[in-house]
Amino acid sequence: MADIQEQISKLCAEATFDAEGEFLLVNVPDEKWHSLAKALKEQLHFDVLSALVGVDWKESLGCMYYLTNSETHEMIHVKVATTNRETPRLHTVSDVWAVANFQEREVYDFFGIVFINHPDMRRFFLRTDWVGYPLRKDYDDSDATNPLRLTPEENEDDTFALVEDEKGETKRVNKKVFGADEYVINIGPQHPSTHGVMRYRASIDGEVVKKVDIVSGYIHRGIEKMCESLTYQQTLLYTERMDYMAAFMNRHCTCLCIEKALGIEVPHRAELIRMMMDELMRLHSHLLSYGCLTMDQGATTAFFYPFREREYIYDIFDKTCGARMSMSYDCIGGVVRDVHPDFVQDVRNFCDVLEKRIPEYHQLFSGNVIALGRMKDVGILDKEDCLNYAITGPSARAAGLHCDLRKTKPYSLYNEVEFDEIVLENGDSYDRYMVRLKEMEQSINILRQCCDMMDKEEGNEYCAKVPKLIKLPAGHWYQEVEASRGIFGVYIESDGNAKPFQKPYRMHFQSPCFNLVGVVDLTCKNNLIADLITVTASLDFVIPDIDR
């Protein structure tokens, strides 16, 4: 990191550094941020904006940018802030990393920071008539400010950009989302193929898609806001209610972040159990993805097959956790109880069953002429697009990107098992579909190795000794795991205050699905409107994980 710090100092003399934390922290004045961002990407190869977190530090408002080098997998974070709370402004980096487009809109929605030169400064989650910015510390949350509205939200066809000229002067430029001559159709929010309350507004020429505008936030629950009034143990509950098909991974990630902050060493058996639950959850998710993708193309028979196998997983969860969904099993320090006596044998039996069933899935659908016609060379997302939009998980590996955290930055006990990272190269809907089926085989392989490790485990310690009241020191931490749909990240900032009990000063969940929905326009453009549903199904995003 010392070498990186030296190079950044040469690029930006005004930058200051803090190298004491897990990642190098770079403090940059806003007026220097855009030029430094371009240099970080083009010269130092920090080509992925992994997370963008808005924070209200009371004396200032700003953002934490977590940047990753896709070749070395090194990470740094950059802090950019403004002391102007009345009209807070920062320069956009959406032209440097395309993923910042939606992420900066999210920050504007919740903190009111307007990003100079951002092309589309609309709210993303909240209604257009919402008053105030909920994640600011001075937010007025009274009913009088935002009374319950029972009227439908009107179409938002107007947006604006704050444009800066060569002299450094800014002016507001009003824009239209769609042109007057564009033919726009509406899909959702209540549509069976959106797999949740998501709305697409698509501009079409004949049957060819020219632009897709995402309208989200229909099930936004303010999870990050709620976490600011909860204990750290209580926040775990909400992590399972974002991507419910990655419930174990999300909760695992949050526990890892808190454990890292406290220096807690988790027992080997507990971490092994966590990893097994994560892989069962991954299988659970990929099975559902297969069923939904096939159903969206009319293959009703193929839709029912994976639900048969998912029942096995539900039964395993139910025996140990006492619930089929929202298991609340991982806890800070380990897991809440030891596994059921039948757990290891049940997992072995399930692996044997699923291994025999996967060829049936291929026979039912993979070679179907309609499936090939609808998915081959359709919805292409190449490697550069994945880096630019911070796409991870199966969708990125289908484009040839080696980004599996279990391999690149092993956490938990993934360095103790052997498995292959499935990487294809076409980046189309078909390869995204195939990656998930092949990853199921690797998860079976991991689970079998874990079962053998469980047989050799000595003792039954499933949780470390953890105080009832969790108190984090002042600071900030960031943790990532490989969830079902890509990299899931948790940002925690603590002010060290523990009166009357300690609650997070700021908690942010970096959702892989939020990035995935950001490429819907890119992947659907110039494809048939009939293929929009297939393309989005192959991206496999979950709406609650986007809205949070």
Where are these regions (language model features)?
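Terminal low-complexity/charged segments
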Residues: 1-208, 285, 367, 371-378, ...
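Active-site bordering "gate/hinge" segments
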Residues: 128, 161-195, 203-548
